[in-house]
Amino acid sequence: MSAPPPPATGFDPGRALQLAARTFEIEARALLGLAARQGAGFAQAVQAMLACGGRVVVMGMGKSGHVGRKIAATLASTGTPAFFVHPAEASHGDLGMLVPGDVVLAMVP
């Protein structure tokens, strides 16, 4: 006795690969565009984080918050004291966690 055939789904492996490749191309172009738009503000932010005598406090909301959480986690795991604070929580008391010497990295779309 053999297993029944899988149900027909209309799945096309070749089409799935085409769509994946197209998605990667779109994302790669977006990253290249972002790299081209970096200016003095980016360099100033990097300099502030490098010179920070305290911690890097990352804030963001929505998708920017998800990215901010990842940035804070990456900084912390690579030796830079950092943590994430949701801006709504910051406005309701969590700003008290900031101390002199901290640098705030506010993520905005």
Predicted regions and their residues:
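Conserved N-terminal alpha-helical segment that immediately precedes and caps sugar-phosphate-binding
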Residues: 1-109
